[in-house]
Amino acid sequence: MKIFFFLALLALVVSATFAQYAESDGSYEEVEGSHDRCQQHQMKLDSCREYVAERCTTMRDFPITWPWKWWKGGCEELRNECCQLLGQMPSECRCDAIWRSIQRELGGFFGTQQGLIGKRLKIAKSLPTQSTWALSAISPNSMVSHIAGKSSILRALPVDVLANAYRISRQEARNLKNNRGQESGVFTPKFTQTSFQPYPEGEDESSLINKASE
């Protein structure tokens, strides 16, 4: 969510940045001296951000932690100071500043943490090329998914477990692991339903009670 906020803010800054350019002979020329001024503001913002990263990270992000009471109040104040520095920047300098912040968010502070997108990419790259169990583990609805459904789960189970769980033979369990076409035979009842007759023919409730009492 934070990244999307940065991107939206970046779009607004880009639109405002073009207003700071002067058009000459069909091309845009940057306002004189803005580059040096932006570098000075960027150095201040980098120092502020690095200080926040050093003092206000949690154990999950950085090996150093500080007392909770100080962390809760002090870090919010430090972040507000960084936001004020960003707000004081000229509009033509904010574009690069926000883009650098996005890069830090994706890569983490000082390389100690991976951003959310980086973590997901790392997990995706570490998955094997062919693994039905991996597909089942990351599927949001594995029991009904055609790609990672019962087939992938059953293939991950030993033959003996399937045979005992569904009370089938080892050969049937082996066929079930390797062939989805056999699944319907497991999940359908093996008994046939018969019509229920409450009393035998020619007898009623009183006759049955008399037989039971004898």
Swiss-Prot record:
GO molecular function annotation: nutrient reservoir activity
Residue ranges of the region described as Disordered: 180-214
InterPro entries tied to this protein: 11S_seedstore_pln, Bifun_inhib/LTP/seed_sf, Bifunc_inhib/LTP/seed_store, Glia_glutenin, RmlC-like_jellyroll, RmlC_Cupin_sf
Key words of the record: Seed storage protein, Signal, Storage protein
Signal sequence residues: 1-28
Disulfide bonds: none
Protein's recorded name: Avenin
Job description of the protein: Seed storage protein.
Native organism taxonomy: Eukaryota, Viridiplantae, Streptophyta, Embryophyta, Tracheophyta
Gene3D superfamilies to which the protein is assigned, alphabetical: Jelly Rolls (2.60.120.10), Plant lipid-transfer and hydrophobic proteins (1.10.110.10)
Superkingdom, natural source: Eukaryota
